[in-house]
């Protein structure tokens, strides 16, 4: 084997070793967080729809829970197929209650908790939009949307 071939083999071996060591030394940049979704209204809320987006495209939704209000017994409706695609930077959630208006909550009500796996970005950039909110008799109401996150690193 010529001197040039040995030098080329040595350089290639060093390059491969450096590549293996650099990938082994990098920690997984993903982490889990939750996004609590609140609807805020002075009027009792019987139905709502929310669109949640992560602007950087680094969000993978891994689960969805119902909120604190017992009148919304089940988790909100959402597109399960989109969630199973494992890279969802946008999801639409919605729920309704058939309870009497007297049983419905008003004020700041947690209506859902979204479990998220974030990848490749230090801080998520969420955007949320309240698409609709309504009363027990189907009238639209003025309401605001609020998000709270908790990181589980």
Language model features by range: what are they?
Residues 10-20:
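Bacterial N-terminal signal peptides
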Residues 2-12:
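Bacterial N-terminal signal peptides that target proteins for export
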Residues 21-153:
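Acidic, low-complexity intrinsically disordered segments
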């Amino acid at each position: 084997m010529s001197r040039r071939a040995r030098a080329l083999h040595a350089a290639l071996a060093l390059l491969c070793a450096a590549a293996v060591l650099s990938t082994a030394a990098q920690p997984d940049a993903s982490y889990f967080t939750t996004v609590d979704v609140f609807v805020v209204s002075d009027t009792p809320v019987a139905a709502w729809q929310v669109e949640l987006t992560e602007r950087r495209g680094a969000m993978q939704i891994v689960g969805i829970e119902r909120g604190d209000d017992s009148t919304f017994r089940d988790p909100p409706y959402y597109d399960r197929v989109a969630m199973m695609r494992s890279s969802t930077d946008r999801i639409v959630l919605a729920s309704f209650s058939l309870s009497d208006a007297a049983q419905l909550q008003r004020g700041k009500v947690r209506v859902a908790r979204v479990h998220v796996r974030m990848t490749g970005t230090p801080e998520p950039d969420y955007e949320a939009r309240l698409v609709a909110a309504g009363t027990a008799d189907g009238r639209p109401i003025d309401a605001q949307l609020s998000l709270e996150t908790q990181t589980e690193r």
